[in-house]
């Protein structure tokens, strides 16, 4: 998918479906066969994209194999979601080219991006300019990214970052409670961010049931990211229920 095909596809899916499901496959957790099967299964139940990545330092060769293996069996886009430069691999359609805006380490704000950018160009990946905001603390994303986690009960801080991202030209904001988070981002925070940010709003972390998913979409989320739920034995049937419910929620 060259040019801005993936971004255009996501926007047209959003018009049709009201809200989208992105399924995150962590290449460190899933083996090649399981990843390829999961990608096919979630495409069937209505997922709009597969994210491949993870917060910890990933084996680049392993990740490239996972992407290649998934690509053969699905039509929906594969979007890289790298935790570091090692997460930039060929064969995907796009990349969440993100800055961890509330990191205390400049490496995760601009340096990793400068190191990874030539590979993004070389591999022909479509960059989706994304402000990545870690909400709360105690998760892998918070620890690895040296994030100064935005407190769950301080939605205006998240909204200020999202507005800054918009002024910097970023068209995507990702509010991340973290992989396997005990609780999800609050609907109040999503609503507050939505009032100021007019781009594509992604919310992930701790989404395990229909009600949570519906409330986040009603508050203004465009896409929900679910990953650990499936790793920890969540059923595809439950995921299908969530997918159908969010498409009726706005």
UniProtKB/Swiss-Prot annotation:
The protein's required cofactors: Mg(2+)
Reaction(s) the record says it catalyses: sn-glycerol 1-phosphate + (2E,6E,10E)-geranylgeranyl diphosphate = sn-3-O-(geranylgeranyl)glycerol 1-phosphate + diphosphate
Entry EC no(s): 2.5.1.41
Top-level EC class as recorded in UniProt: transferase
Location of this chain's protein in the cell: Cytoplasm
InterPro entries registered for this protein in UniProt: GGGP/HepGP_synthase_sf (IPR038597), GGGP_HepGP_synthase (IPR008205), GGGP_synth (IPR010946), IGPS_HisA/HisF (IPR050064)
Pathway the protein acts in: Membrane lipid metabolism; glycerophospholipid metabolism
Sites where the protein binds Mg(2+): 26, 55
Gene Ontology molecular-function annotations: imidazoleglycerol-phosphate synthase activity; magnesium ion binding; phosphoglycerol geranylgeranyltransferase activity
Main localisation: cytoplasm
GO biological process: glycerophospholipid biosynthetic process
A cellular component annotation (GO) from this entry: cytoplasm
SUPFAM superfamilies: FMN-linked oxidoreductases
Chain residues that bind sn-glycerol 1-phosphate: 174-180, 205-206, 227-228
Keyword annotations: Cytoplasm, Lipid biosynthesis, Lipid metabolism, Magnesium, Metal-binding, Phospholipid biosynthesis, Phospholipid metabolism, Transferase
Signal peptide as annotated in the record: none
Keyword Cytoplasm: yes
Function: Prenyltransferase that catalyzes the transfer of the geranylgeranyl moiety of geranylgeranyl diphosphate (GGPP) to the C3 hydroxyl of sn-glycerol-1-phosphate (G1P). This reaction is the first ether-bond-formation step in the biosynthesis of archaeal membrane lipids.
Family: Belongs to the GGGP/HepGP synthase family. Group II subfamily.
Protein name, entry field: Geranylgeranylglyceryl phosphate synthase
Organism: Nitrosopumilus maritimus (strain SCM1)
């Amino acid at each position: 998918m060259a040019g801005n095909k993936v971004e255009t596809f996501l926007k047209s899916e959003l018009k049709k479906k009201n809200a989208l499901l992105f399924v995150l496959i962590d290449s460190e957790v899933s083996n090649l066969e399981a990843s390829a099967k999961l990608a096919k299964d979630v495409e069937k139940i209505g997922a709009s994209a597969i994210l491949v990545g993870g917060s910890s330092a990933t084996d680049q060769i392993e990740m490239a194999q996972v992407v290649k293996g998934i690509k053969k069996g699905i039509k929906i886009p594969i979007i890289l979601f790298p935790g570091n430069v090692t997460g930039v691999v060929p064969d995907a359609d796009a990349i969440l080219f993100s800055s961890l805006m509330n990191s205390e380490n400049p490496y995760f704000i601009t340096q990793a991006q400068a190191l990874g950018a030539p590979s993004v160009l070389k591999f022909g990946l479509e960059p989706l300019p994304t402000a990545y905001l870690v909400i709360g603390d105690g998760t892998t994303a918070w620890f690895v990214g040296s994030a100064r986690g935005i407190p769950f009960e301080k939605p205006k801080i998240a909204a200020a970052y999202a507005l800054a991202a918009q002024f910097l030209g970023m068209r995507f904001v990702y509010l991340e409670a973290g992989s396997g988070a005990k609780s999800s981002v609050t609907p109040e925070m999503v609503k507050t961010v939505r009032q100021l940010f007019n781009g594509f709003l992604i919310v992930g972390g701790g989404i395990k049931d229909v009600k949570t998913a519906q409330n986040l979409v009603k508050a203004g989320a465009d896409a929900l990211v679910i990953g650990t739920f499936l790793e920890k034995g969540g059923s595809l049937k439950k995921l299908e229920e969530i997918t159908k419910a969010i498409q009726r929620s706005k």
